Amino acid sequence: MTHLMTMTRHASKLLAAAFLAVLMALTMAIMPVFAQGTAERVPASTAEISLTFAPLVRQASPAVVNVYTEKNVTQRGMTLEQMMFGVAPQSRVQNSLGSGVIVGAYGIIVTNNHVIQGADTFRVVLSDRREYAAELLLGDERTDLAVLRINTEGLPLPVLPYADTRDTQVGDLVLAIGNPFGVGQTVTNGIISATARTDVGINDYSFFIQTDAAVNPGNSGGALVNTRGELVGVNTAIFSRTGGSVGIGFAIPSEMVKRVVDAAVNGGTFVRPWLGLAGQSVSFDIAKAQGLDRPIGVMVTEVYPGGPAERAGLRRGDLVTAIDGREVFDEKGLKFLAAIRNPGEQARLSILRGGKAQAINVRVEPPPGATEADVVLLTNGSVFNGARVIELSPRLAEENGLDPFTRGSGIYVHSVTRGTISRNYFRPGDIIRSVNGKQTKTVKELQAVLKANTRDWDIEIERNGRIVRGTVRT
C-alpha cells in the first residue's frame, strides 16, 4: 500500500513537470507573434510621421489671385492758395487690395463687391506673379459679390470647382487662401464652425458658412476650400473687436457664388428670384402649438396677391419647414434657398398646415414691377425739379432692400440731379407719400399734383423708416 502511494506521488510529479514544460513551450511560441504585433517601428518616410496639407495647397492655391484696385479721387473745392495762383484742384489715387478666385478657365474671377466697389481700374496678380488688367462684368452690392474677367489670350487657367455645400458639415476641415494685409498669398486652416449663419448683417441674403480658419483684412474675396480641393465659399467678413482674426470668419456659400457668376457670364444682370411671401421665425411657443418638439421653420404672415406663393396655394398661417429638403429657421434663410435657384425653376416647400405635413411646388420668378428703365426725371418748376422717381413695386423693393408689400403706397426717389432745387430737400431712397394733402401712388398722380400753380408745397415723405412732414416755399 505504501509502495503504491509512493509510485502515485512520483507519477503526479512527472505529469506536473510535463504539463509545465508544455505550457512554457506554448508561451515561448506565442510570445514572438504577440511582440511582432505591438513592437514600435521607426517610420520609413516623412509621410508616415506628418499630417500635411501641402498636396491640397498645391492643387488649390494657383486658382486664388490677388486683386488690386485704383480709384482716382479729385479734390472737391479749392484752397485759397489754389484760387490765388490759378492752380487746378489736385487728384490722387486711392489703392485697395483683396483676393479673388478663378472659377472660369479663361479668365473668370469672383471676388467681393466691397473689394472693387467704386474703383476705376482693376489689376489681377496670379499665384505665379503674372499680372493682368481686368474688366468688371458684374458688381452686386446686395450679395457682396463681383465678377471680373481677364484676357488670357486663350491660355487656360487653374480653376476651383464648386463644392455642394449640402454635403458640408460642422467639423469639416477647410483651408482659407487669400492675401491678408497685402503680404502675399497665405494659407490658414480650420474647421467649419457653422453652416447657416443668418444674423451677420452683411447683405440681404445673409446665409454664411462660419469658419475658425484665420481670416484677416485682404482675405476678402479669397477661397474657403474643402479637403477635396473644392470651393466651399468666398471669404467675406470677420467678427472682430480689434480688426484682426479672432477665429470667427464668414464665407458666402458656393451656390450663391455660382448663381452670380453665371449671371455675369450670361448677360451681366443678377435677377433675384422671388417667392412672394413674408414670414416670421417660429418661437418655442408657436412650435409647441404646431406639435413640434423644437422651433423650426418660417410662419407665413403675408402672401403677395398673384405672386408665386399664392398661385401655388400657400396661405397665411402655413409653416414652411424646408425648401428642397433643407431646413429653414428664418426668413433670410428662406430667401437664400430661393435665390440660389434660377428664375423659372421649381422649389419644393415642405409645410405644416393645421398640424398636417404637406409639400407644395412653387415656381420662383423675378418679382413684378418697374425696372431702371421706368425711372422718370421730373423737370417742372416745382420743388421736385431734378428728382428721378419710380413707382414702388416688389421688384424695386427687392433691389433696394425695401418691404415688397408696400405696393401702391408711394413714389420712390431713385436719384437727385446735382445742382437742382430737389437736391436741397430729397435724398435717394426717400418715399414720397403725399403732396399738398393728396396721396401719390403713381408717377402720373405725382405729375398731376405738380402741375398746380402754387409756391407752397406740403410734403410727406418716408426716410429711413420714419415719416417726415414739412412745407417748402419756392
Give names to the regions the model predicted.
Residues A251, T417, G437:
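Conserved residues at beta->alpha junctions
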Residues G291, D403, Q447-L450:
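Short proline/glycine-enriched turn/loop segments at secondary-structure junctions
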Residues A17-P32:
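Bacterial N-terminal signal peptides
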Residues F34-Q346, L352-A357, R363-N385, I390-R395, ...:
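Serine-dependent protease modules
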Residues R272-G279, Q346-P366, N385-R388, R423-P428, ...:
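Intrinsically disordered, Ser/Thr/Pro/Gly-rich linkers and terminal tails that flank
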Residues N385-I432:
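C-terminal accessory/binding modules appended to enzymatic or scaffolding proteins
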Residues M1-S12:
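N-terminal secretory signal peptides that target proteins for export/translocation
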